[in-house]
Every structure is written in C-alpha cells, then in structure tokens.
C-alpha cells in the first residue's frame, strides 16, 4: 500500500503564514514523491541505480528545506519565549503600580497581537507533511510498515545495505518529526473520550455534548 501525505489538505490562508506554507508545501510534495519512489522500487518498477539517483536528489532537497523549517521554528519559539517573559514582567509592573492600567493594556495588546501571529506560523511549520491531525495514526502505521518492507525487500532487490540503512534512517527521522502531531492527536482523542464519559454520567446535555464533540472532531480535520 502506498503511503500518502496530505499535501492537498488545506489551501494557504492569508499572508501571515504564506512563507511558512510555501516551505511546508514544498516539503510535503518532496516527502510524497520520495515515499512513492520507495514503493515503486519495492514493487520492482525501478533499478537500484535509478532509485538511488532520484532518491538522493529528493533527500538533498528535503534536507535543505528541513534546515530552513527548523531554523524558522527555533526563531519563532525563541521570540515567543521572549514575549511571554515580557508579559509576565508587564503584569508585575502593573500590579506594583509602576505603570498605569492604560499603558498596561496598550502593551499587553501589542504583545498578544505578535504572539497571535507567531502561533499559527509555528503550527504550520510543525506539520511538514501537511497531513490532517486525524490521519496521523494511519500515516504513522503505514510508514512503520514501509520501514519493515525496506529492511526486508531492499537487499533482495540488490539495494546496497548502507543505502537501505539510509532510507530507514530518513523514514525514522520523519516519524520523529511527527511527534508534535502525534501528541496533538492524542490530546484531542483524550478530550473526546472525557467528553463521552461526562455525557454518559449525565453531566452534559445531549445537545451540549454533540456541540463540543463536533468542535473537537473538526480539529482532527485540520492540518495545524
């Protein structure tokens, strides 16, 4: 079975995340092509030489884009940490009456606005395969199966052992890059399960239960 990424899941939404979306869209396409290439090779549709040449091309392009993605993530996380610390300092300065209520509100709005712009940028970058949150378990399962297939069939198809290990290493790195998405999926699923229990014990009315459940299920349809 061919593993598919969710590269067409969601169109770019607004100029604020345009650059981040471009990076992730390119990465998603390359991952998709690379995974399809692996499957074609395992099905006997390519010689080892052609496979290794094209795979290496995708690999180098993915590496360059991933370096850019990780640099952007580090920059945004650093800035968000700085802004959060500024908020805490601002709150303390206001509590001891060093600054007025008006000045506190003005600065807080300014900081909140910047944080509000950085959070969606970071969320986009943390999904390099542009896959729906709800599709994460199936995608992860398919990648794990692909790893097993490469280990088993690669040597049989005359792929050098060092290249087999290289492909497996890259697939494992992709799984590692998905850890934030896995945690998001598990958090949402846990919230849905808790909601069902609250409904069953009578804490929530049927309509309220359905409203909250639909809200959580919509989150599983998002790519960030």
PLM region spans:
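Acidic, Ser/Pro/Thr-rich low-complexity regulatory regions
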Residues: 1-224
């Amino acid at each position: 079975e061919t593993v598919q990424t969710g590269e067409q899941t969601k169109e770019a939404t607004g100029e604020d995340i345009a650059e981040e979306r471009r990076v992730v869209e390119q990465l998603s396409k390359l991952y998709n092509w690379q995974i399809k290439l692996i499957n074609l090779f395992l099905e006997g549709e390519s010689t080892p030489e052609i496979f290794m040449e094209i795979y290496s091309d995708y690999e180098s392009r993915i590496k360059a884009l991933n370096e850019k993605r990780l640099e952007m993530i580090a920059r945004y996380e650093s800035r968000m940490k700085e802004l959060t610390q500024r908020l805490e300092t601002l709150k303390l300065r206001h509590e001891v009456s060093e600054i007025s209520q008006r000045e506190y509100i003005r600065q807080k709005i300014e900081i909140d606005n910047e944080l509000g712009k950085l959070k969606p940028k970071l969320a986009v970058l943390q999904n390099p395969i542009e896959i729906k949150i709800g599709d994460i378990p199936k995608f992860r399962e398919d990648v794990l199966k692909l790893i097993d297939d490469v280990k088993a069939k690669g040597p049989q198809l005359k792929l050098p052992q060092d290249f087999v290990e290289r492909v497996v290493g890259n697939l494992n790195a992709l799984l590692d890059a998905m850890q934030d998405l896995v945690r998001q999926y598990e958090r949402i699923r846990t919230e849905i399960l808790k909601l069902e229990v609250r409904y069953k014990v009578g804490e929530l009315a049927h309509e309220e239960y359905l409203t909250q459940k639909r809200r959580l299920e919509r989150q599983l349809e998002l790519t960030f």
